[in-house]
């Protein structure tokens, strides 16, 4: 399985309730693409699920599977609106916005001097002659 990221991937879902697999609508809002187009079946991705009524949310790693409907399996929860790392029990019948994201804890950031921070480690500079370990 490949971890794949893509810009502007979003679909909605009507929550079945619970903490299991999310059934996606198969349609993307204007200006977005579907998981099928952007991620592809069998690939993992970072995602956010937002309950548009209660504003509960979770960020995680999931696997998209095409079908009727396409589904997103919630494999690893990285964070949620309660401050934990467990799957959110979304309210049955609520509309969910499901989209690809790049979690802050997984990002690599360059400071103003061009030094990369990976987690709590400084280690790489894209400027010639500077390296920090």
Predicted region positions:
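Short, surface-exposed terminal/edge motifs of secreted or surface/virion proteins that either
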Residues: 59-61, 67-75, 124-130
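Acidic glycine-/aspartate-rich tracts in secreted/extracellular proteins
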Residues: 27-29, 51-55, 65-69, 78-80
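Glycine-rich, low-complexity segments
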Residues: 1-31, 78-132
